[in-house]
Amino acid sequence: MAIQANMTVGRRKEAVARVRLVPGTGNITINGRSMDEYFGRETSKMILVEPLKLVDQMGKLDVFVNAAGGGLSGQAGAIRHGISRALVELNPEYRPVLKKAGFMTRDARAVERKKYGRPGARKRFQFSKR
């Protein structure tokens, strides 16, 4: 039975990643560029391949990603979320392993909004006693 290509969406902060997994040689393409070309930081690259390594699919699947919004760190997290969802669609047996590692859960942390009467979300203006 041939493995079908499947599309999934991953999100983190303001970033959205549309991920497509295809049987192949392990190439990861993000917005038409290679992973090494797109991400300068080694930690971002490590974040991407974590789910593939966990289920031993590294080098067996090609990953095509369209990432938009947010910064590079948020996009890396969104891509990891998308890859995890795609792997579960590919093989439902991967779900418990990926869920235990925390890759199936959408990271809900986001920037706290700025409040009025303050310079930021939590910071206060300088207090003068006299």
UniProtKB/Swiss-Prot annotation:
UniProt family annotation: Belongs to the universal ribosomal protein uS9 family.
GO molecular function: RNA binding; structural constituent of ribosome
SUPFAM superfamilies given in the database record: Ribosomal protein S5 domain 2-like (SSF54211)
Keyword Ribonucleoprotein in annotation: yes
This protein's UniProt keywords: Ribonucleoprotein, Ribosomal protein
Organism encoding this protein: Anaeromyxobacter dehalogenans (strain 2CP-C)
GO biological process: translation
Keyword Ribonucleoprotein belongs to the record: yes
UniProt-listed NCBIfam families: PRK00132.1
GO cellular component terms, A-Z: cytosolic small ribosomal subunit
Protein name: Small ribosomal subunit protein uS9
Taxonomic lineage: Bacteria, Pseudomonadati, Myxococcota, Myxococcia, Myxococcales
